[in-house]
A protein has these predicted regions:
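Active/ligand-binding-proximal structured segments within catalytic/core domains
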Residues: 76, 87-100, 108
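Short amphipathic C-terminal alpha-helix that caps PH/PH-like domains
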Residues: 34-35, 95, 154-159
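An aromatic/glycine/proline-enriched structural segment found at the starts
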Residues: 18-83, 187, 242-257
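In a subset of proteins, long, contiguous C-terminal domains/tails are tracked
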Residues: 221-257
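M16 family metallopeptidases and their MPP-like homologs
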Residues: 16-22, 71-83, 109-219, 235-244
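Conserved, carboxylate-rich catalytic/transport cores that coordinate ions
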Residues: 8
Length: 257
């Protein structure tokens, strides 16, 4: 606790702070209140950004026992060397949306949740930094411990299909519509919009960046999406971690047999 207090005292302050407000408010009133609350809160030390480094991590596959837990948890992750202004980023974002980001309409959800009934919830995400070449592909699922092997096999199969066979033209066109609508809905939320505008202040961007990105999405071809997925999402490099009461699941299986 003393270390945390010292860190706060040595580094915290509003000298480099940014404030973004969205909604119905009085600008003069907010400006006066901001000065009243933060003008004297000076940062003890100058701000220095810590650069994030990409690391190609050797894949691991491990299971951890969590006794007496009814549900098991599956996590998969892959580090990707890419930034969000890379020409391939839009293709990867749309590819992930079709793979696991589009919830019930995604391939992972269709296969693992709806078709095979192996998971209560499954999905994936793809993110990339705006400053450094540090991106990541991430997937997760909640499931019954006895379904561990089947779920992992289905996950690997869908990753393999996405990176070798790719997506169809019909899938890509449908995904464009859904993905763009989700971004529009997100911007309609004041909290999301304020957060985006605040980060853009730091990045020296405007909403024009979003407009250009969404234009890229509209113009993507299946070939571009499939090429990007094959280039960046390497199945053999994905780390998989599972946690659950697998011992009890094995005992139940023995009893049934």
């Amino acid at each position: 606790l003393d270390d945390a207090k010292k860190f706060y005292k040595d580094f915290y302050g509003a000298s480099n702070g940014q404030l973004t407000i969205v909604g119905d408010f009085d600008e003069k009133e907010i400006s006066a209140l901001t000065k009243q609350l933060f003008a004297d809160w000076k940062s003890p030390r100058p701000f220095t950004r810590i650069k994030q480094e990409y690391h190609a991590i050797a894949p691991i596959n491990k299971s951890f026992e969590t006794p007496d837990k009814a549900n098991a948890f599956f996590i998969a992750r892959l580090n990707v060397k890419i930034r969000d202004d890379n020409p391939d980023y839009a293709a990867l974002a749309l590819g992930n949306y079709m793979l696991g980001g589009g919830f019930l309409n995604s391939r992972l959800a269709t296969r693992i949740r709806q078709k095979e009934g192996l998971s209560y919830g499954v999905g994936s995400s793809f993110n990339a930094s705006s400053l450094d070449e540090t991106g990541s592909f991430f997937a997760n699922a909640i499931y019954a411990p006895e379904n561990a092997d089947k779920l992992e096999a289905a996950f690997r199969d869908e990753i393999r299909k996405a990176t070798t066979e790719g997506f169809t033209a019909e899938e890509v066109e449908a995904a464009k519509s859904g993905y763009l609508q989700s971004r529009q809905l997100s911007r309609a939320q004041d909290r999301e919009l304020a957060g985006r505008l605040n980060s853009y202040l730091y990045l020296d961007r405007t909403i024009a960046f979003d407009a250009a990105f969404e234009e890229q999405i509209k113009n993507l071809t299946p070939a571009q999406v499939n090429a990007a997925m094959k280039k960046y999402i390497t199945p053999d490099s994905i780390t998989i971690i599972k946690a659950g009461d697998f011992a009890k699941a094995k005992e139940k299986l023995k009893t049934v047999q």
